């Protein structure tokens, strides 16, 4: 019988629990649900496995407070850390979540140095950088969940604007995973038709698309303000699963993620949201889009914001 991949989820909060549920439904692999809070991962694991009996899923889920249980993981998704509360920016979380990431990274280095790692913890672009530097893993095996989520928000708002199925919409959001992200209307399409062409056809306006771009930039903040007690978790978890599946099944999908750049887009030693190809070796390729002067200026501004945050943890 073929052995299931081992997937460890570091952090058993809302995103961690949702990830485990999705992995179980899709039967992507056996799960270790880790958390420092005693009883929480164990309780969720039991609940999820009981749900699995009705779903016909034989996936094994183990709740743990011991990092040794992640030993030999094929993939790891990190959600540990404080979530955003109303009035907090992603950047306010830096100092406390950096300490948590350093601890997580040391344990990955010790127990699962061959794993493919996806980071979700905010501020994303900084946390994924800390994981890379502290774990010693190769850069093609450490990525951040950013653009997949931002693009999903952009896709939804565009589908609503054009009154079409979300399946017909493809969009790209570049840059840092924050308010300076760069949703690219020119590279976004409805059934292959670029947004600027649809505007020329009279199906929308530049003004409406700009409003959608602003709403996309504040997509996470909008949910934080409504929830009042935390941040989004269904869409972030689903976005990470898309990335995980491309890795485990060697799908070689092009997904926008926070990837480590070494000269691409003229950027060195930074994690920035760009389109990449994810396969069984991790990041196979970085796709370099040709940007207009205006797009490049917005992208550079977003990158500069990431660079300033990184300086705070160096």
From Swiss-Prot:
It catalyses: (S)-malate + NAD(+) = oxaloacetate + NADH + H(+). It is an enzyme of class 1 (oxidoreductase). InterPro entries: L-lactate/malate_DH, Lactate/malate_DH_C, Lactate/malate_DH_N, Lactate_DH/Glyco_Ohase_4_C, Malate_DH_type3, NAD(P)-bd_dom_sf. Its EC number is 1.1.1.37. GO terms for biological process: lactate metabolic process; tricarboxylic acid cycle. The active site is at 177 (proton acceptor). Substrate binds at residues 84, 90, 122, 153. Keywords: NAD, Oxidoreductase, Tricarboxylic acid cycle. It holds the Pfam family Ldh_1_C. The keyword Phosphoprotein does not apply. It comes from the Bacteria. One of its GO terms (molecular function) is L-lactate dehydrogenase activity. The keyword Methyltransferase does not apply. CDD domains: LDH-like_MDH. NAD(+) binds at residues 11-16, 35, 97, 120-122. Catalyzes the reversible oxidation of malate to oxaloacetate. NCBIfam families: MalateDH_bact (TIGR01763), PRK06223.1 (NF004863). Belongs to the LDH/MDH superfamily. MDH type 3 family. This is Malate dehydrogenase. It comes from Rickettsia canadensis (strain McKiel). The lineage of its organism: Bacteria, Pseudomonadati, Pseudomonadota, Alphaproteobacteria, Rickettsiales. The gene is mdh.
């Amino acid at each position: 019988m073929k052995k299931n991949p081992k997937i460890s989820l570091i952090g058993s909060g809302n995103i961690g629990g949702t990830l485990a549920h999705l992995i179980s439904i899709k039967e992507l692999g056996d799960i270790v649900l880790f958390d420092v809070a005693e009883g929480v991962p164990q309780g969720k694991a039991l609940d999820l496995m009981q749900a699995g009996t009705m779903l016909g899923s034989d996936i094994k889920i183990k709740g743990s407070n011991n990092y040794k249980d992640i030993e030999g993981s094929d993939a790891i998704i990190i959600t540990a850390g404080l979530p955003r509360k109303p009035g907090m920016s992603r950047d306010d979380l830096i100092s406390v979540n950096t300490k948590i990431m350093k601890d997580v990274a040391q344990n990955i280095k010790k127990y699962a140095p061959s794993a493919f790692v996806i980071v979700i913890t905010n501020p994303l672009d900084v946390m994924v950088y800390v994981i890379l530097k502290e774990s010693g893993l190769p850069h093609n095996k450490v990525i951040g969940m950013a653009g997949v989520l931002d693009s999903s928000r952009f896709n939804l708002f565009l589908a609503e604007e054009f009154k079409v199925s979300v399946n017909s919409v493809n969009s790209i959001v570049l840059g840092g995973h924050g308010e300076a992200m760069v949703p690219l209307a020119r590279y976004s399409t409805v059934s292959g038709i670029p947004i600027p062409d649809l505007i020329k056809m009279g199906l929308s306006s530049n003004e409406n698309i700009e409003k959608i771009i602003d709403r996309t930039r504040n997509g996470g903040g909008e949910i934080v303000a409504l929830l009042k007690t935390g941040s989004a978790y269904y869409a972030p978890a689903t976005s990470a699963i898309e990335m995980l599946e491309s890795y485990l099944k060697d799908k070689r999908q092009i997904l926008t993620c926070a990837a480590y750049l070494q000269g691409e887009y003229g950027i060195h030693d930074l994690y920035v949201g760009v389109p990449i190809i994810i396969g069984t070796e991790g990041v196979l390729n970085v796709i370099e889009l040709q940007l207009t002067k205006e797009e490049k200026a917005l992208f550079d501004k977003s990158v500069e914001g990431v660079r300033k945050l990184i300086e705070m943890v160096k």
